[in-house]
Amino acid sequence: MTKKQAIKRKVKEPEPTNEQSSASEPSDNEEDDDLLQAVKDPGEDTTDDEGIDQEYQSDSSEDLEFESDEEGNYLGRKANNEAEGDAEEDEDDDEEEDEDSDEASEDNDDAEEEKPSSSMTAAVQTKVEPIIQIIPRDPSKPEYEDSDTSDEEDIRNTVGNIPMHWYDEYKHIGYDWDAKKIVKPPKGDQIDDFLRKIEDPNFWRTVKDPQTGQEVLLTDEDIALIKRVNSGRIPNAEHDEYAPWIEWFTSEVEKMPIKNVPDHKRSFLPSVSEKKKVSRMVHALKMGWMKTTEEVEREKQKKRGPKFYMLWETDTGRESMRRIHDPVSAPKRDLPGHAESYNPPPEYLFDEKETKEWLKQKDEPHKRKLHFMPQKFKSLREVPAYSRYLRERFLRCLDLYLCPRAKRVKLNIDAEYLIPKLPSPRDLQPFPTVESLVYRGHTDLVRSVSVEPKGEYMASGSDDKTVKIWEIATGRCIRTIETNDVVRCVAWCPNAKLSIIAVATGSRLLLINPKVGDKLLIKKTDDLLAASPSLDVIDNERIKTAVQWSNAEPEEQEKGVRVVITHFKPIRQVTWHGRGDYLATVMPEGANRSALIHQLSKRRSQIPFSKSKGLIQCVLFHPVKPCFFVATQHNIRIYDLVKQELIKKLLTNSKWISGMSIHPKGDNLLVSTYDKKMLWFDLDLSTKPYQTMRLHRNAVRSVAFHLRYPLFASGSDDQAVIVSHGMVYNDLLQNPLIVPLKKLQTHEKRDEFGVLDVSWHPVQPWVFSTGADCTIRLYT
């Protein structure tokens, strides 16, 4: 039997008492006794001086064998010689260890309880490695019960960490692991909560789970944990916060040298190599080969030269430095022209009109085209001395030494670069391009035209004192209504439920039922206009003297005239409100009563302004807001009819305003002037024109926006109707797009008049124009 088998059997057998062990198992030889002293008793403490359990194992997977030398010291070495012989024995030993592992563990525990005495040192013992016992996990308990991980939480609601108030409007509160809705539990009212407070003894420890909405009963451990947290103590009651401190690592810094080798004896003797080096340097100094530091500095100073320097780079540039840098020569005077000759051609001499204009600008000489008046002499000897010679020489000297001179780089900018890039007109269709119909029947100037809201009929007014109703599709004149004066303006009511035409003729405003279209609509209009006015409204004297309401005479009733509103001055313009109940008239000669607002349903009139801010040309209602636009000769004022105050004043910078039209959205205004301009105002942007368009050669008399398409048209005395694209975007950061599309010029000019009015079809992209040639033209 080998030594290892004997040691293992010693471990397996129960350990006897001290007396029995010493008597029954005497040591066989001295080697076994020394082996017991070398091997540490497994019953002793296996911790090091720091308190950490130490597990003694072999240096490698092979076994260690202990031998003793002559002095009794035991050495461990690998059993290389007996590796083959012990291989079979090791296999048997492993089988025996597996069978008797339980008995060995019990014997090991007994050995720890009873330490061997001195008599037991003779017994052969062996070092037994500690056996690690794996305790199986209880499946009924969570794997991470005592840890902080959240992977094993009992999560019923799988919505995640989101605000649960997102589910307040739903009947469910989330989804379970089967993707089914978790229905909210029924909620009680305040009475149920009050009864639970009284009857339920566990009400105070019941909380609501926000994930599932269920009520959870807190255990005693939960309540104790909450109390400890509220009191500021450690949540775990088993934790000892005053446990003795174990200093696993020392806090004392031990300063020890890296090497502690004593100095050599030759380190105390002077260096021989340094002695030779110094002797060579002394010899070089004596021979002049080596220079001292002072000599080196003196040589460097000689190489640097003197410290003073020249004020200028070169002697030749001294004079140029004294002068002005880059002098600019004085501009030369303009050479005399033909007008300054003593005998100029006749076309350069002033006539009486030019002479008066030149003398009129005496106080503003800078506005004169020439600073002198050309004169003609027969011969050079007749030319007198120049009277302005000294003054011009003096002004020239002032310009030379008082006016600063500078060189300006001339920018060569291509003209095409300044022109904005506009889309092609082909991409902006549809818009009218050709003349389709010509409506003939009037015998004098056709001043105004208006289209029915449905787009089937059209009304026109002329200087021949007639109003004509036209069928648009066929060009046939359905009815002609004669008036007693020149028709300045006609306006069809924009309300499609009424069939009314407002005609301004002289100082009378006629409300006419044209009797075209639906018969029920015609009857409804007659019933509305035949209703007697209310008597509870009392007009003041100022209104009574300005306007009077009356029913039409029987002769006019047959023509279709229903109501006559008589004004105290000639009417120039009439316009409707978008709902068709209010209409406004303009009398330029009416001073502070130039503009009047009439209400059709109550048959009453109002004077909105008590003072005249200028000669009113035209008025306009806002399509959406309760605002009123009033255009004078130079400016446009916007009033709030509800608050009765001025909102904004638009500056046109023009001589005379002829008309205006507002965009259907109400944010942009188009103004026409007699000085050949069209002004586009962005009401949200500024009080000054956003864009000024000079498309016509003569006065622009009328402008109009289309109700549906991004189109607007203008008519001028140059017999042209110009159709343009005007897109207004909902994005406030994007400017309107204005593109001229087509110039339609088919009217004839008579008495310096051309196109007098333009109007759009309410549905189709068609435009109507009236002219001085007594015609109405349709462009499609």
UniProtKB/Swiss-Prot annotation:
Pfam families membership: BOP1NT (PF08145), WD40 (PF00400)
Biological role stated in the UniProt entry: Required for maturation of ribosomal RNAs and formation of the large ribosomal subunit.
Localization per record: Nucleus, Nucleolus; Nucleus, Nucleoplasm
Biased composition (Acidic residues): 44-53, 60-72, 83-113, 145-154
InterPro entries membership: BOP1/Erb1, BOP1_N_dom, WD40/YVTN_repeat-like_dom_sf, WD40_repeat_CS, WD40_repeat_dom_sf, WD40_rpt
WD repeat boundaries on the chain: 441-482, 484-522, 566-608, 611-649, 652-691, 695-734, 750-780
Ranges annotated as biased composition (Polar residues): 17-26
UniProt region (Disordered), positions on chain: 1-155
Name assigned to this protein: Ribosome biogenesis protein BOP1 homolog
Source organism, top-level taxon: Eukaryota
SUPFAM superfamilies with a match to the protein in the record: WD40 repeat-like
Similarity field: Belongs to the WD repeat BOP1/ERB1 family.
Annotated Gene Ontology cellular component terms: nucleoplasm; PeBoW complex; preribosome, large subunit precursor
Entry keywords, A to Z: Nucleus, Repeat, Ribosome biogenesis, rRNA processing, WD repeat
Entry keyword Repeat: yes
Segments of skewed composition (Basic residues): 1-11
